[in-house]
UniProtKB/Swiss-Prot annotation:
It holds the Pfam family Tn916-Xis. Keywords: DNA integration, DNA recombination, Transposable element, Viral genome excision. InterPro entries: Tn1545/Tn916_Xis, Tn916-Xis. This is Excisionase from transposon Tn916. Signal peptide: none annotated. It comes from Streptococcus agalactiae serotype V (strain ATCC BAA-611 / 2603 V/R). The gene is xis. One of its GO terms (biological process) is DNA integration.
Amino acid sequence: MKQTDIPIWERYTLTIEEASKYFRIGENKLRRLAEENKNANWLIMNGNRIQIKRKQFEKIIDTLDAI
């Protein structure tokens, strides 16, 4: 890890790949959730790249029994 790298658990946003590892949810499932919830407050589109707001997505997951 480079000195300028921010640990994944401190990042504000995560890529689909990072979120998949962090939340232990498949990449395809996360892409599908993003596609189905385009206006969700936990989602940011950076061009065509999906970014997930970590803390807000954690709150969503806390309320769910299953994904």
